[in-house]
Amino acid sequence: MGKRLAMIVTLLVLALLAAPGAKAEGVKRALVMGFDTFQSQPSTTPSSANNVTLMANALSGGSMNLYQLVTHLDDLATTEAFAQAVQEAFDGATDEDINYFYISTHGVWQEGMSNGALQLLLSDGTNEGSITAWEMRRIFDAVPGTKVLLIDACRSGAMLGKGVHGPLENVFQGDDYKVLCSSGGAEESWFWAGETGDGLRSGAGYFSGALVNGITPRGSYGADVNDDGEITLHEMINYLLENHGASTPQVYPEEDDFVLFTYDADSFTGRRREAAMEGISFDSVVLTGDSPRLDFHFTMLRPVQVIYQLVYFGPNGWQFETSQFIYDNAERYGIYGDQPGVLSPGVKERSLSLNELDSDDYGYVLVQILTREQDKLTVQTSRVICVPPSTGDPLMEALVPASFSPETGQELTLVVHHQYPCELTIWVDDAEGNTVRRLTSRRATRPQQLRPLGTTISWNGKLRDGSMAPEGTYRFRIRANIGSEVYELISPTFTLLSPQG
């Protein structure tokens, strides 16, 4: 018999009782669901189950003050059951409310399909079904308020028209949607699974683990860059892009200051940390093929095992099946005896040498720093290391849509094909050749599984000062740095339209 679990938790109902004359604030509700058992795809047990637990705890923590939290695990197999779960979880919502939705499952989509046809698989443990991005939009459109969608599934970025060759529509375009996807439309979204010392199954999604690290004490609220107790959508995507390397997270809207998560920053002190490690910093994520040595440092807060995982990128993607695991044995014969990888508290400086690149002198390497404590494995960070060749024309090509209208919520996605790993700088120039915005500055590329190889980046139509660019004709100016060589490309022009344009 398949697993069936539906739990409803009502939290802090008293928070809804405003003092006389006080301004009423929006109510927060959350629906968290995961699926591990499938007919057409491999089982992910127990990763989605653990993702559900992690996300439920994260969303009900801090100072979120959720009114209601509903979780589902392997107990929905039809679009109708999904719609009913959404209706029940967000029943009573108003236009002022914030509605959180998280899902962990398999995503099914491929180039040539409409991105609205992307499927997220559903299951009740025995029967399997699916829901398309279009159907999700229709169901959530009936929910008043702001909808925050957190999607951990392969190719999920396709629903935003991101991480694909495009141009494709954004299924969730609109002021009332805030969306984070674990991967671009051409990418897998990875999870890990294993066994503990006592034979129990363990595992979780890499994206979900990074997301939880960013918004909980487990990761010292790492996404809150300015330590103000508010983690915005913009802060969250920046944190994920830096600390989650197995896929390329996608966001809508870009550069949005909507507050996703809150916590009491004043009460979070250094006296008692849940995190085992903090302050992870890499000297550079761009290395040279003739000397691929990675230097980094971090601070241990308590003694735990530290393990480095190196995953090389090959023709078919990340080669997790042949990844290297390296215990940090610098202190093996210290006060912790001969237990491999245990480090004492304090600042640590380390170096790793990389090899097995996909060519003689260039490629991508995923470096993950893991800690093991009481047989519990945690991914502390996951960084993509870019190793460009020492020389070589990347043969760049730029693809852009003909037009977009940012004041209606549209964003324009640029696709840059480049044959080699490199550092990209991208400017937006107007028709007179004046630069109105710089989108990136020597940003290291990362594999997005595009064919031909390449990078996607989106522009929301805003200028340096945050105001909207005027209607008119624009183009991208693109520079690729490979070693000491510089290559430049001007994209085709595109038109920024007014809402009536």
Where are these regions (language model features)?
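Cysteine endopeptidase catalytic domains of the caspase/legumain-like
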Residues: 24-284, 295-297, 302
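Bacterial N-terminal signal peptides
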Residues: 8-17
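Aromatic/hydrophobic beta-strand junction motif of beta-rich domains
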Residues: 294-300, 412-418, 459
